[in-house]
Amino acid sequence: MAIQLTRRGALSLLLFLTPAVMPTWYAGSGYYPDESYNEVYAEEVPQTPILDYKVPRWCYTLNIQDGEATCYSPRGGNYHSSLGTRCELSCDRGFRLIGRRSVQCLPSRRWSGTAYCRQMRCHALPFITSGTYTCTNGVLLDSRCDYSCSSGYHLEGDRSRICMEDGRWSGGEPVCVDIDPPKIRCPHSREKMAEPEKLTARVYWDPPVVKDSADGTITRLTLRGPEPGSHFPEGEHVIRYTAYDRAYNRASCKFIVKVQVRRCPTLKPPLHGYLTCTSAGDNYGATCEYHCDGGYERQGTSSRVCQSSRQWSGSPPVCVPMKINVNVNSAAGLLDQFYEKRRLLIISAPDPSNRYYKMQISMLQQSTCGLDLRHVTIIELVGQPPQEVGRIREHQLSANIIEELRQFQHLTRSYFNMVLIDKQGIDRERYMEPVTPEEIFTFIDDYLLSNEELIQRREQRDICD
C-alpha cells in the first residue's frame, strides 16, 4: 500500500532528519549537546576528537591570579597549552596555593586539575590588659604590630610581632605590668597648744590624697601613728601613711604633729611648808596650794594658778610660827584656832605627881619631832581647883577655859585619861593608861592623815631619825 513505508525508507528518513535536531558542539569547550524534551533522536556515542599535538591551543591558556604557571610542552617553544603540556603552578609572596601544584593538558582538552592563590593571613591578635597595639597592614603577611601600655604601666615581653609566611605571629604576647607606685600627699604638719590643766591636745586632720597612676585603684591605706582626733602628749609625733595599689606597689608620706604645753616657772615650797599641785604642777591651768608644817600657819594667798601668759597668779605666801591666843572667852574659841590646822592630844591628871602622867609626859617630850611632823599640839590639864593648871606649851589657860574643856571632852579629874582629837575637832581615840609615841603615831598614820599628808610623810620618812 502507498501509506506503508518500507524499513529501508524509514531509516533513510531518520538519518535525513537527524542533523536538523542536533545543536552546535564546540570541540574542547567542555560542554556537551543539550537534550530537548520536545525532540526525539537516535542515541549516539559522542565523537572522540582527533588528537593533534601540533595544535598550539589544545587546552585553554592557564592564567592564575596572584600566581604563576611555568609550563613545559613536548613541542617546546611557545606551545604553553598544547596537548601533553605540563604546568607547575606557584603563587606570589603573600599567597598560598590551594589545589594542584602541577597540571597537564589532557586529550579531553581540559587541564588535569584546578588551583588558585589565596592571600595569606594571620589570626587577629587578642588585646592585652591595660594596653593596645597598632599594625602596619592588618593581619596580612609582613604586617608589624607594635604594642604599647596605658599610662602607669610598663611593657614586658616582645614590643613588636610580625605576621610570618606560616600564618603565625613572631614572638610571644607581651603583658602590661603596673610598676609605678601610687601618688600620695599627706596633710601639712601642725602644731597645737595643750588645753588648760591638761598635758595633751586633741588633734584632727584630713586623710591624705591618694591616686594611682595606673588604673586608679588603691587597695589599702595604712596609718602608722594615732588616729585623727586622738589626744597627743607634749612633744613631736610623726604620722606616716602608706598606700598600696593592685600590683602591691606602695608609696608613703609623713607629717609631724607637735603639741606644746604652756608652762610657768617651777614654784618653790615655802620655808616650813610644802606645795600640793594639780596636773603637772607647772602647766597652764595648774593650781598649787600652799601648806605649812605643824606649828606654823600660812600668811598670804592659799593657792596660785598658772596662767596662759606663763606666769603665776598672786604672790607666794609664807609660813610663820603659829600664834595661840589663850585670851578667849570660851573653850570653843580656843579650839577653833586649831580647826583644820592641828590635831590635839589633851592629857588630864589628878595631880602633877601622878605616875601615869609623869611617864606619859616623859615619853612625849622625847618625841617632839614626830608630834610636829603629824601636826599634834599637846594640852595639859593637871591638878584640882583652885590649884589646877592648864597650859599649851608656855601659854597658861584660865580656870574657865579648863572647866569648859573638861566638860566638852568628858575628862575627869579623878584619874589619868587622855583624848586624841583630829583636825575637824572630832574625838578619835581615848586612853586610860600611858601609851608610847609610836602607838599614837601609828594610829594617826593609819587613820587620820590626808592624801597630801601621806605623800609628805613618805618624803619625810626619815626626817626625825
UniProtKB/Swiss-Prot annotation:
PROSITE patterns: HYR (PS50825), SUSHI (PS50923). One of its GO terms (molecular function) is identical protein binding. Residues 177-261 form the HYR domain. Contains chondroitin sulfate chains. SMART domains: CCP. GO terms for cellular component: cell surface; cytoplasm; excitatory synapse; extracellular space; synaptic membrane. Residues 69-119, 120-178, 262-321 form the Sushi domain. It holds the Pfam family HYR. Keywords: Angiogenesis, Cell adhesion, Cytoplasm, Disulfide bond, Glycoprotein, Proteoglycan, Repeat, Secreted, Signal, Sushi, Synapse. One of its GO terms (biological process) is cell-cell adhesion. Residues 1-23 form the signal peptide. Its main location: secreted. Coiled coil: none annotated. CDD domains: CCP. It is found in: Secreted; Cytoplasm; Cell surface; Synapse. Disulfide bonds join 71-105, 91-117, 122-163, 149-176, 264-306, 292-319. Acts as a ligand for the urokinase plasminogen activator surface receptor. Plays a role in angiogenesis by inducing endothelial cell migration and the formation of vascular network (cords). Involved in cellular migration and adhesion. Increases the phosphorylation levels of FAK. Interacts with and increases the mitogenic activity of HGF. Promotes synapse formation. Forms homooligomers. Interacts with PLAUR (via the UPAR/Ly6 domains), ADAMTS4 and CTSB. Interacts with HGF; the interaction increases the mitogenic activity of HGF. PANTHER family: HYR DOMAIN-CONTAINING PROTEIN, SUSHI REPEAT-CONTAINING PROTEIN SRPX2. This is Sushi repeat-containing protein SRPX2.
